[in-house]
Amino acid sequence: MKEKYITIVGFNHYYGVAPFKIGKKIKCVKEPSNPYDGEAIKATMKQIGTIGYVANSPYTVAKGTKSAGGIAHKVKKKFTVEVMFITSSKVICKVVDGFKEKKGLELLEKED
């Protein structure tokens, strides 16, 4: 499967870039009841809670990464990402765990 990347933004409303370190694993959780964005996915850390959101606007999604709406159908309700790059306004992460299983032919090929 081709690697998938997402952009985390909005962290300046929480703890800034301080919680983010290259290689750090972050839990992402779909938030369909979010009043501002039905496709919202929050980024969380166990000890401190919400640290940002997966970008879902063409103005905030880094080139080459998926938006919250673009990744939502490919991942489970909770999934894990790994921090790859950090800038002052964006954190680029690779999705490392929590993909939905493919059904049909691809699943049959995996069993062989």
Describe the predicted segments one by one:
Residues 1-112:
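Conserved active-site motif detector
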